[in-house]
Design a protein with these regions (language model features):
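Thiamine diphosphate
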Residues: 394-436
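Short Gly/Pro-enriched turn/cap motifs at secondary-structure boundaries
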Residues: 114, 129-132, 156-159, 173-175, ...
Length: 436
C-alpha cells in the first residue's frame, strides 16, 4: 500500500510536536535521572483532548482515527520514549478493552473519564510465570455470589501506581488453560489492592512501572469485562492494537535519534569538512532514513486496517517487530555518529539508546511477534495426541514401483483416462474432488 497522511494528520503532528518540544523535551533529562513521572505534562495532554484521541466524542474522546493516535505516540516519543508509552498504555491497554468489550454502564463509568484524561488507565496481564505465555496466569478470581475475590499479583505494569483504573486478568475456572481466564475492571483504592515499588529501569524512566498486589480484593460482579472465560480473547485482541502504539513509540525514539545525529553530522567538522560529507557516514544516514520510512509505512498501514475494521493482527505484529528492531539499529548508529560525546549522560542519543531496547520486549517480545506473523502465514498446526508431536495433513503417496513409468496404451482415450484416475486413487491422489 502506498500511504500518505492527510492534511489533518500533519496539522495534528505539528500541534503535538510543538507541545512535546515546549513541555516535555526541556525536562526529559531530569525525568530520566530522577525516575520521575511527568504528571503535569500528562495532565495537559488530557486538557488537549489527546488522552482519548481515537475514541468517539460521545465517550469523551477526540473522535480521531487510529493513525492520529499513532502520530501522537510517535511525536511524544520523539523527545521522550517514556512519555510516549504513558499515552500508548493508557489508550491501547487501559481504555480500549473497556471500549471494545465493556457494557454501556462500564463505558460511562470508566471509559468516559479515561478518554477525557481525568483518570489514567493500565493493563494487568504479566505475571512472574505468565510473560510471553499468558496461559501461565496464576492470579485468581473466585465467584463469591455478589462479587469475585481477587488474589495474586502482576509485574511490570506500565502506568502503575499512577493509574486509577486497571484491566486485570485472572483465572476464574482452573485447570482448563486460557479458556478459564476472565477480565475485570479494578479501581485503585479498593481494599486489598496495593502496589510494589516503582521499578528502577534501564530506559523509559519517566514511565511509571510497578507491581500490582491483590489480597482478597472484592470485585463487584458488574466489573466483569465481557463474559467469564473471555479474558484471553480480550487480552490478545488488546495486544494486537497495543502493538501499533509500541511500534509508534519505537519509531518516535528512532526518529528523534536520527534527527539529532543528522544535525550533529552537519556541524561536526573533521579533516576539514563536516563529517556528513564522509561517504561512510552519509551512507549510514541514508540507511537510517530508509529504515524510518519503512517502519512508518508499516505502522500507518496497520493503523489504517484497524480503523476500517479489517484484520490487522499480522500487520501490527510486523510493524511492532520491525519498528523496534530498527529503533535499536538507528539509536546505535546515532550514538556512533556522535562518537565519545554520544556516550555521555545528558545526551539525548544516549537516553534514546537506552529507551529503544524495551520496545523489543514488551507487548510481546519480537520473538513472539515472529511467531504471530508465522502463524498467520502458515496457519495453526494441531498438536498430536502422543509425545507432543505435530500432526500434519497426510500427503498423497508418491508414485513408485511399476506405475512410476506405467504407460496406458489399451483402449480409447477415455479408457486410458479412467485407468489413470483409478491408478492415481490407489496412490492417494484424487483430482476429481470438487468436480460435479
Amino acid at each position: 500500500m502506498l500511504f500518505q497522511t492527510t492534511q489533518a494528520h500533519e496539522e495534528l503532528r505539528a500541534k503535538i510536536r510543538a507541545f512535546a518540544e515546549e513541555e516535555v523535551k526541556p525536562i526529559a533529562f531530569s525525568l530520566d535521572q530522577a525516575n520521575e513521572f511527568p504528571a503535569e505534562a500528562v495532565k495537559k495532554l488530557g486538557e488537549m483532548g489527546l488522552m482519548g484521541i481515537p475514541y468517539p466524542k460521545e465517550y469523551g474522546g477526540a473522535g480521531l482515527d487510529a493513525i492520529s493516535y499513532a502520530i501522537a505516540v510517535e511525536e511524544l516519543s520523539r523527545v521522550d520514549g517514556g512519555t510516549g508509552v504513558i499515552l500508548s498504555a493508557h489508550v491501547s491497554l487501559g481504555s480500549w478493552p473497556i471500549f471494545a468489550f465493556g457494557t454501556e454502564e462500564q463505558k460511562q463509568k470508566y471509559l468516559v473519564p479515561l478518554a477525557r484524561g481525568e483518570k489514567i488507565g493500565a493493563f494487568g496481564l504479566t505475571e512472574p510465570n505468565a510473560g510471553s505465555d499468558a496461559g501461565g496466569t496464576e492470579t485468581t478470581a473466585v465467584d463469591k455470589g455478589d462479587h469475585y475475590l481477587l488474589n495474586g499479583g502482576k509485574i511490570f505494569i506500565t502506568n502503575a501506581p499512577k493509574a486509577d483504573t486497571y484491566v486485570v486478568f485472572a483465572v476464574t475456572t482452573p485447570d482448563i488453560g486460557t479458556r478459564g481466564i476472565s477480565a475485570f475492571i479494578v479501581e485503585k483504592g479498593w481494599k486489598g489492592f496495593e502496589f510494589g515499588d516503582h521499578y528502577d529501569k534501564m530506559g523509559i524512566r519517566s514511565s511509571s512501572t510497578a507491581e500490582l498486589i491483590f489480597n482478597d480484593v472484592k470485585v463487584p460482579k458488574e466489573n466483569l469485562l465481557g463474559k467469564e472465560g473471555e479474558g484471553f480473547k480480550i487480552a490478545m485482541a488488546t495486544l494486537d492494537g497495543g502493538r501499533i502504539g509500541i511500534a509508534a513509540q519505537a519509531l518516535g525514539i528512532a526518529q528523534g535519534a536520527y534527527e539529532s545525529a543528522l544535525e550533529y553530522s552537519k556541524e561536526r567538522v573533521q579533516f576539514g569538512k563536516p563529517i556528513a560529507a564522509q561517504q561512510s557516514l552519509a551512507f549510514k544516514l541514508a540507511d537510517m532514513a530508509t529504515k524510518l520510512r519503512c517502519a512508518r509505512f508499516l505502522i500507518y498501514s496497520a493503523a489504517e486496517l484497524k480503523e476500517h475494521h479489517a484484520p490487522y493482527g499480522m500487520e501490527s505484529a510486523m510493524a511492532k517487530m520491525y519498528a523496534s528492531d530498527i529503533a535499536l539499529e538507528v539509536t546505535n548508529d546515532a550514538v556512533q555518529i556522535y562518537g565519545g560525546t554520544g556516550f555521555l549522560k545528558g545526551m539525548d542519543v544516549e537516553r534514546m539508546y537506552r529507551d529503544a531496547k524495551i520496545t523489543t520486549i514488551y507487548e510481546g517480545t519480537n520473538e513472539i511477534q515472529r511467531v504471530v506473523i508465522a502463524s498467520h502465514l502458515i496457519g495453526k498446526i494441531s498438536k498430536g495426541n502422543e509425545g507432543g508431536s505435530r500432526s500434519v495433513a497426510k500427503k498423497p503417496a508418491p508414485i513408485t514401483g511399476v506405475r512410476k513409468r506405467q504407460i496406458f496404451r489399451d483402449g480409447e482415450s477415455k479408457d486410458k483416462v479412467a485407468a489413470l484416475v483409478e491408478a492415481l486413487k490407489k496412490d492417494g491422489h484424487d483430482f476429481t474432488v470438487g468436480i460435479p
